[in-house]
Each structure stands twice: as C-alpha cells, then as structure tokens.
Amino acid sequence: MSQINLLLLCGGGGDEHAISLMSADFLETSLAKEPEINLLRVELDGQGHYRTQDGRSCELTNRKEIRFAAEEQAPWPVDYVIPCIHGFPGETGDIQSYFDLIKLPFFGCDSESSSNCFNKVTAKMWFSALGVPNTPYIFLNELNQESIAQTKQALENWGSIFIKAASQGSSVGCYRVDSQDELVSSLEQAFSFSPYVIVEKTINARELEVAAYELNGEIVATKPGEIICASNTFYSFDEKYAANSKAETKVEADVSEEVAQQIQAYAIKVFKGMKLSHLSRIDFFLTEDNEILLNEINTFPGLTPISMFPKMLQNHGDDFTHYLYSNIKSQLVSA
C-alpha cells in the first residue's frame, strides 16, 4: 500500500480535551512505527477552530483536505482520520456525521452507535433490549419538584444513588448521593452538564472492564481487568487522571473462568448488537453474589499511559500498533 495521509484529530474543546491530547500522544507514538503512515496532527478547540501542532490555522474541508489559512501553502489531502476526541464532539457521534457527509473513512464507531452509547438513557434502553443485565435506574428530563420527588423516592428505596448527567464521559457530572442533604445540589450540578439525567441505584460491587475490539475480521473481548478504588469512593474523573489518585488497576481481574466468560460473552453481544466498530471499553459491575451488571460502554476509550484499553489488548497478546494499522488498512482496501 502506498503512503497514507492520516489526520489525527484531537481535543474537541470539551471537558475531556486535555485527556484527548494525552491519548493522541499515545496514538502518534504508535503510528510512528509504521513507515506507510504520513501523519498530520490537528487540534480542534471549543470554537471549532483547527490548529496544527506548530500553530498553523487550518480547516478540514468537504474536499477531504486540510486547507491552511496561509494561502501560499498547498492543501494537504486526507485519506483517513482518527477522531481522538473523548466526549463531545467525538464520542457523541457528531463529528462522524461530517466525515460520512464528505465520505472520509475514519477509525472507530459510527455516528449512531457512538451517540447511542454516549447517552446513558439510550444506552440503558439498548442494554435491556439486548437482554444484558444493567443497574436499576430512573430517567429525568427536567429539574423540577416532580423530578426532585422522584429522586428522593429512589434514594429512600435504594439507600444510596448515583446522579449522572446523561451525556457526559469520564464520570463528568456524576455524583454519589447517600443523604437527602446532597440530593438537590447534585441534581443541579448534573443538569448543568446535560439536559437529561439518570438516577441509578448504587451497586456495591467490583468494577471490571473489558477491551472489545475488531481484529482480522473478528470481534475480540479480553479477559476482564479491574479498577480498585479506595473505600467509599468511585472511579471519578479525578480518580482516573489525578497524579495522586489512590485507584489501582489490574489488567486481569481475579475472577472465576465462568464469570470471565460470561462477561466476555456480554461484551461481544453488545458490541455486535449496538454495531460498534474497531474499539470499545465495556465496563461491568460484579456483585458479591456474582451478579454481572453492565455499567457503560466507551466508544473511544482513553489511550493514556495509565489507560486500561491498550494494557488489556496487549495482555491479550495483540500488539497495539499492529491492531491499529490492520484496521486502517482493511478499511481503506474495502473503501
């Protein structure tokens, strides 16, 4: 195959902008090992402005090229794009719609599957429709006296709840509530991040994660890894990325073969059922009674030095650069 002009688009301007840049570093290092890849890294900010690493203003046009603000510089044709954008507008599916419109091949899930997974309400509807157990919840579409009363009743019934902004990732807009005193302020904060909110029953369980991805025409689900948080905490945004995080990770969780196989089967079922593409990290709860509950799907999981997806893929025996390049090549050949 001849040289591939690959656009590594990162940032996005949302709450996870900085994490997206860290993931882009990892991807850039991995792709540097492939001589056929001619990579241009471009950062997208919250105002929709594109800028190269050396500060040049540019834009991605409908002619599938990067056009630079300096008119004397020739446009850079784009063969393929990796939208390394956590949260909006990447994992929400927005930017993939534009790629489809201009017929530009891209890495990762398409617009519809990204949107369905990112919105916690639609995701849970899909989980239930596919017959995959998930956490009990209620759905709120407005902050008013009725929704406050519903949430108070949920807290009374379940003892402890999570209030979550429906359209955020990396635990942004996610609050554990154990008393009525915290309830209204947590709802207000969650609604400040999203017009829709879900209230979930707190599950006292182990947090397990699976890397589910495509390789050589097959869907692979790794053995589950585990996130171990300090007592009475959850895997918040700060716990994920703070330098002083007390959370620990295990690339392989200590679970029975039966539990591991069931989790892998659920992961493949939702990957196929929700028509995901190329990569995902699928998160589960495992209760003391060995009940498995699907928590969420990340359609563009973190690829930082501490992220679980590349670690689990490597532990499964797959080289990340080979996996990435194989998907790029197969997609371009079939395009």
UniProtKB/Swiss-Prot annotation:
Residues 124-329 form the ATP-grasp domain. Mg(2+) 2 binds at E296, N298. It comes from the Bacteria. It is an enzyme of class 6 (ligase). Gene3D superfamilies: 3.40.50.20, ATP-grasp fold, A domain (3.30.1490.20), ATP-grasp fold, B domain (3.30.470.20). It is found in: Cytoplasm. Its cofactor is Mg(2+); Mn(2+). Signal peptide: none annotated. It holds the Pfam family Dala_Dala_lig_C. ATP binds at residues 154-209. GO terms for cellular component: cytosol. This is D-alanine--D-alanine ligase. It comes from Shewanella woodyi (strain ATCC 51908 / MS32). The gene is ddl.
